Amino acid sequence: MRLLLMSDTHLPKRAKALPAPLLDEVPRADVVIHAGDWVDTATLDLLEGRSRRLLAVHGNNDGADLRARLPEVAYADLGGLRFGVVHETGPAQGREARCAARFPGLDVLVFGHSHIPWDTTAPGGLRLLNPGSPTDRRRQPHCTYLTAAVDDGRLTDVVLHRLPPR
């Protein structure tokens, strides 16, 4: 099972559209995961129309229209792994322990908010993934997103994709 992970698209404030390399990944993914801060409903409509399956949440910059359509936290069993998606996890210091306590029973937690890519494993095995932002690099050298796979109940092939400058 192929996964495409993104967050913090902030359209149209940070870019006019999603980057072409990211959009090219959408039809190849079995599941597209978006960890919030869409800002406009057009991006949600676009990904709902192009994705085989969309697992998504709203973020702190999303208005009432997006909050009405998306949960604060989403859960799914994907290929034998229990996934959670949330926008904000708090400060980097102590994140692993805090998330492991808040989300017991998960194998993978996808989050956003910081626009800073993150890939760590908490004590007890919870994998924490932040794909960064494909449209707003915020103190990072590149805009980013992640791809990954689930194979025989294992998360594999986690790759951070760095987008060329706009």
Question: Where is each model-derived feature located?
Answer:
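N-terminal active-site segment of His-dependent metallophosphoesterases
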Residues: M1-R52, D62-P71, G80, P141-C143
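Helix-adjacent hinge/juxtasegments
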Residues: S51-G94, G105
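Residue-level detector of beta-strand structural context in well-folded domains
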Residues: V73-A74, P117, L146
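Binuclear metal-dependent phosphoesterase catalytic core
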Residues: M6, L78-G79, A101-G105, L129-R166
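Short, conserved loop/helix-junction motifs that constitute active-site signature segments
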Residues: L47-S51, A100-P104, A122-P123
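Pre-active-site segment of Zn-dependent metallo-hydrolases
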Residues: K13-D24, V85-F103
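Active-site environment of divalent metal-dependent phosphoester hydrolases
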Residues: H10-R14, W38-T43, N61-R67, G90-E96, ...
